[in-house]
Amino acid sequence: MTIAKTILLFVLAAAAEIGGAWLVWQAVREGKEWWWAGLGVLALGVYGFAATLQPDAHFGRILAAYGGVFVAGSLAWGMVFDGFRPDRWDIIGSVICLLGVAVIMFAPRNAG
């Protein structure tokens, strides 16, 4: 259950952070209404809160591992919402990042 919870929280955090940043981008760079940026700021707040729900107690570990999720999630978001087509290097890089996430979060550690 801990692995499933960790993954679910990373997906929630990614949706909130990437979605929030995308909303701000739309307002600033694409000329959308100002309230898009406001919604983006709210979503970014949800991202910050979601990280606190992770079962691991170490801020540095959570945010370092989340960085890999952010890389892969950003590419996926771009594909879905902006028609971005990642090349093989984007995909290879994101797979490497996700492998790093798995090592950081799920490697066996001593309790002490």
From Swiss-Prot:
Positions in coiled-coil regions: none
Mode of membrane association: Multi-pass membrane protein
Similarity comment text for this entry: Belongs to the UPF0060 family.
UniProt-listed InterPro entries: UPF0060
Regions that span the bilayer: 7-27, 33-53, 62-82, 88-108
Protein name listed in UniProt: UPF0060 membrane protein Arth_4238
Organism encoding this protein: Arthrobacter sp. (strain FB24)
Keyword tags: Cell membrane, Membrane, Plasmid, Transmembrane, Transmembrane helix
UniProt cross-references to NCBIfam families, sorted A to Z: PRK02237.1 (NF002586)
One cellular-component annotation, GO: plasma membrane
Oxidoreductase listed as a keyword: no
Compartment annotation: Cell membrane
PANTHER family in alphabetical order: UPF0060 MEMBRANE PROTEIN YNFA (PTHR36116:SF1)
Broad class of where this protein is predominantly found: membrane
Organism superkingdom: Bacteria
HAMAP family: UPF0060 (MF_00010)
